[in-house]
Amino acid sequence: MIKKLSKLVKDFTLSELRTGMKITAKELVNKKITVQFPEERTPISPRFRGLHALRRYPNGEERCIACKLCEAVCPANAITIESEMRDDGTRRTIVYDIDLFKCIFCGFCEEACPVDAIVETQIFDYAFKSRQGSIMTKERLLEVGSQNEQAINQARLEDAKYK
């Protein structure tokens, strides 16, 4: 009986509504934390895992040796690699595709790579006009790597102290 009476008093005095209004009034005078995204950007961690890139050596040769460790370790089976032997006896990729719709951006491919060929950049704002655009081909991956080599190196330097 006392519980019912107590609930009736709370409902009648609108105590929950007053509590909510008090919180709202308090937050009205606090500093806003909203970021106006396209114009303003929040800092990104050096460990952020975004769009993939394939790297090259300083002499221009691609780093990937087609060991297929990244393909084997990928939990989402998002990576497809086909390779061939060169005349000098080394193996190189002819097809290196990553399906970004399948990829869960776990970073296992980057960790498994023995030559640091595949990396995840800090690029997070990208879009596709068609489903086919979600497949990153070897050429597109190398292009992303070439365009962002300095940013990739900087992020890896910042992250090195935590490894």
From Swiss-Prot:
<dbReference type="GO" id="GO:0005506">
    <property type="term" value="F:iron ion binding"/>
</dbReference>
<keyword id="KW-0408">Iron</keyword>
<feature type="binding site">
    <location>
        <position position="113"/>
    </location>
    <ligand>
        <name>[4Fe-4S] cluster 1</name>
    </ligand>
</feature>
<protein>
    <recommendedName>
        <fullName>NADH-quinone oxidoreductase subunit I</fullName>
        <ecNumber>7.1.1.-</ecNumber>
    </recommendedName>
</protein>
<comment type="function">
    <text>NDH-1 shuttles electrons from NADH, via FMN and iron-sulfur (Fe-S) centers, to quinones in the respiratory chain. The immediate electron acceptor for the enzyme in this species is believed to be ubiquinone. Couples the redox reaction to proton translocation (for every two electrons transferred, four hydrogen ions are translocated across the cytoplasmic membrane), and thus conserves the redox energy in a proton gradient.</text>
</comment>
<keyword id="KW-0472">Membrane</keyword>
<feature type="binding site">
    <location>
        <position position="67"/>
    </location>
    <ligand>
        <name>[4Fe-4S] cluster 1</name>
    </ligand>
</feature>
<feature type="binding site">
    <location>
        <position position="70"/>
    </location>
    <ligand>
        <name>[4Fe-4S] cluster 1</name>
    </ligand>
</feature>
<dbReference type="InterPro" id="IPR017896">
    <property type="entry name" value="4Fe4S_Fe-S-bd"/>
</dbReference>
<comment type="subunit">
    <text>NDH-1 is composed of 14 different subunits. Subunits NuoA, H, J, K, L, M, N constitute the membrane sector of the complex.</text>
</comment>
<dbReference type="GO" id="GO:0009060">
    <property type="term" value="P:aerobic respiration"/>
</dbReference>
<keyword id="KW-0830">Ubiquinone</keyword>
<feature type="binding site">
    <location>
        <position position="106"/>
    </location>
    <ligand>
        <name>[4Fe-4S] cluster 2</name>
    </ligand>
</feature>
<dbReference type="GO" id="GO:0048038">
    <property type="term" value="F:quinone binding"/>
</dbReference>
<keyword id="KW-0411">Iron-sulfur</keyword>
<feature type="domain" description="4Fe-4S ferredoxin-type 1">
    <location>
        <begin position="54"/>
        <end position="84"/>
    </location>
</feature>
<keyword id="KW-0479">Metal-binding</keyword>
<keyword id="KW-1003">Cell membrane</keyword>
<feature type="domain" description="4Fe-4S ferredoxin-type 2">
    <location>
        <begin position="94"/>
        <end position="123"/>
    </location>
</feature>
<dbReference type="Pfam" id="PF12838">
    <property type="entry name" value="Fer4_7"/>
</dbReference>
<feature type="binding site">
    <location>
        <position position="64"/>
    </location>
    <ligand>
        <name>[4Fe-4S] cluster 1</name>
    </ligand>
</feature>
<keyword id="KW-0004">4Fe-4S</keyword>
<keyword id="KW-0874">Quinone</keyword>
<feature type="binding site">
    <location>
        <position position="109"/>
    </location>
    <ligand>
        <name>[4Fe-4S] cluster 2</name>
    </ligand>
</feature>
<dbReference type="GO" id="GO:0005886">
    <property type="term" value="C:plasma membrane"/>
</dbReference>
<keyword id="KW-1278">Translocase</keyword>
<feature type="binding site">
    <location>
        <position position="103"/>
    </location>
    <ligand>
        <name>[4Fe-4S] cluster 2</name>
    </ligand>
</feature>
<keyword id="KW-0520">NAD</keyword>
<keyword id="KW-0997">Cell inner membrane</keyword>
<keyword id="KW-0677">Repeat</keyword>
<dbReference type="GO" id="GO:0051539">
    <property type="term" value="F:4 iron, 4 sulfur cluster binding"/>
</dbReference>
<dbReference type="InterPro" id="IPR017900">
    <property type="entry name" value="4Fe4S_Fe_S_CS"/>
</dbReference>
<dbReference type="InterPro" id="IPR010226">
    <property type="entry name" value="NADH_quinone_OxRdtase_chainI"/>
</dbReference>
<feature type="binding site">
    <location>
        <position position="74"/>
    </location>
    <ligand>
        <name>[4Fe-4S] cluster 2</name>
    </ligand>
</feature>
<dbReference type="GO" id="GO:0050136">
    <property type="term" value="F:NADH:ubiquinone reductase (non-electrogenic) activity"/>
</dbReference>
<comment type="similarity">
    <text>Belongs to the complex I 23 kDa subunit family.</text>
</comment>
